[in-house]
């Protein structure tokens, strides 16, 4: 069975993917006050979770930082990925455990996606891109070829990153930004062309 950690809107999208793949979800896990059912699926507290060795998990939380914190608590668990049937992935693409790929996303040859990443609706990850762990590429964002994205970074909706650019760890690329040069670790960049606006102060 599969459990989804986080009864959220993002969780509903993952639930839909798994339903389309005929992979049954046993329950959402959420310690906040939630209804007994969410998306037609039971919601349980983490202290009610008793995993069998074969049970699988996906952390269904959009925030990179929150996803990382949950992953630390659940270290040693069996994580699985979910890839929408109308996403387009080259046969040479690597998507690691815990990551999700939404409808309409395109991942081209030799792209690599780390653990617990989100490749959101309609995002494009072009040839030979490499994404670290806990990365979120938002809807309709475009990474051109040979882009590198460091752990815990977020590329927001509609942003474009030109070929060969490196985005550092914990960086944030604002919605609609056009990134023409490398982005340092922890930088928040916005605009066209993208420029540094502030610092992402989240520290692991």
Where do the model's predicted regions map?
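Generic C-terminal helix-cap and adjacent flexible tail
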Residues: 196-204
